């Protein structure tokens, strides 16, 4: 199409968005029982490239749930922000004499500290409660109680690629 000036042209571009989400389900069985899992994942939540993932797994003696999110460009800073929360409840009181509840929270980010040197700090917080009965092993009885753990994790990454997706130069 011609523009308002002979040197200008109007270009019309039609963009068709592809599906960015997934739904998954699975089931299995074995000598220790059966398992059923269900998950939902979205790779472009709110059209901003935010990845959201949730999973729920059931087995004969346990239930596990997790919700995680990764924002690759948090507040337009070119720094990512990732969070995850999960909980696992296992009940083996009848067979092995113990019951465990574990809750976890994780928070992390990444940013370029110096040219091509990236810093990835994160903090993980875990709380576990272990209950036993006289049927439990001696080692499990010694571990009975509440545990709180905090871990600071970091990674340094030196990246000389010319681009992250399909690089043609660098390492």
Please identify what each model-predicted range represents.
Residues 1-171:
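Gram-negative/organellar outer-membrane beta-barrel architecture
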């Amino acid at each position: 199409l011609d523009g308002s000036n002979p040197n200008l042209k109007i270009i019309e571009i039609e963009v068709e968005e592809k599906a960015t989400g997934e739904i998954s389900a699975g089931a299995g069985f074995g000598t220790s029982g059966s398992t059923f899992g269900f998950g939902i994942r979205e790779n472009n939540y709110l059209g901003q490239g935010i990845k959201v993932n949730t999973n729920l797994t059931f087995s004969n003696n346990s239930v596990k749930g997790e919700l995680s999110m990764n924002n690759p460009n948090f507040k337009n800073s070119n720094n990512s922000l990732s969070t995850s929360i999960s909980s696992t409840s296992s009940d083996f009181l009848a067979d092995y004499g113990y019951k465990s509840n574990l809750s976890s929270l994780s928070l992390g980010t990444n940013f370029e500290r110096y040219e091509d040197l990236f810093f990835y700090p994160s903090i993980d917080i875990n709380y576990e409660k272990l209950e036993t009965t006289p049927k439990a092993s001696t080692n499990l009885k010694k571990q009975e109680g509440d545990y709180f753990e905090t871990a600071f994790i970091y990674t340094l990454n030196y990246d000389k690629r010319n681009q992250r997706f399909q690089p043609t130069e660098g390492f």
